[in-house]
Swiss-Prot record:
Keywords: Apoptosis, Cell membrane, Glycoprotein, Membrane, Receptor, Signal, Transmembrane, Transmembrane helix. This is Insulin-like growth factor-binding protein 3 receptor. Interacts with IGFBP3. Interacts with CASP8. Its main location: membrane. The gene is Tmem219.
Length: 240
């Protein structure tokens, strides 16, 4: 009898308070989504990209990653040209040459059309300098020098120190062929979330999901026990 009355109360609430029912369903869906996302974050502790990386830099470097960087045949001094210089730190693979334990610098000039730019930006030149750190210091600093309209307007996700930007001593050639900068990189630019960040984010999302699901259950139980139709509702049905 009690279960029938509770079901009847829920049916009356559904019939006479649709906005409340819709709000409860929305909270329930959000809670279930939070449970699923939180569980995913807690079980996948590696390989997730940081959402704070600007997508325009990702697209720019993916286009740049289709090119080959050709080292100079002899040691020369390169001058940074262009009113705007941006430096960012990436993880690149330049091969295991005999000088892999030394900091090396490679330089190339590219046109906007080579990285997918159109219009007036297609003919603009960009001077790219890569400073490959020694094995003890992982990471490669990439410096882009050119007019501001060619480079992405947002700040680079991982800035690189501009120490020694004025002049760059270029290293000798590392073999007979040009070097494919991103030949071994699946993602051109990515900053992975650490396991601590994933655990913190996953636990908070999971807790929020549990809270929303419990809130929906509490609303349903309260409605089933406490909701009663107004007396005038029965009188109106009797008159009809």
């Amino acid at each position: 009898m009690g279960s029938c009355q509770a079901g009847h109360n829920l049916h009356l609430c559904l019939a006479h308070h649709p906005p409340l029912v819709c709000a409860t369903l929305i909270l329930l869906l959000l809670g279930l989504s939070g449970l699923g996302l939180g569980g995913f974050l807690l079980t996948h502790t590696t390989g997730l990209r940081s959402p704070d990386i600007p997508q325009d830099w990702v697209s720019f470097l993916r286009s740049f990653g289709q090119l080959s960087l050709c080292p100079m045949n002899e040691t020369v001094t390169g001058t940074w040209q262009g009113p705007h210089v941006v430096g960012l730190l990436t993880t690149l693979n330049f091969g295991d040459g005999p000088d892999r334990n030394k900091t090396q610098t490679f330089q190339a000039k590219i046109h906007g059309s080579q990285i997918g730019l159109t219009g007036s930006s297609a003919g603009e030149s960009v001077l790219v300098t890569a400073r490959v750190a020694s094995g003890r210091t992982p990471g490669t600093c990439l410096y882009f020098s050119g007019v501001p309209k060619v480079l992405p307007s947002s700040q680079p996700p991982i800035s690189c120190s501009e120490e020694g930007v004025g002049n760059a001593t270029l290293s000798p050639v590392m073999g007979e062929e040009c070097v494919r900068v991103w030949s071994h990189e699946r993602l051109v630019l990515t900053e992975l979330l650490t396991s601590e960040e994933l655990a913190l984010c996953g636990s908070r999302v999971l807790g929020l999901g549990f809270f929303l699901v419990l809130l929906c259950g509490l609303l349903c139980c309260t409605t089933a026990v406490c909701f009663h139709p107004r007396p005038e509702f029965h009188w109106s049905r009797t008159r009809l």
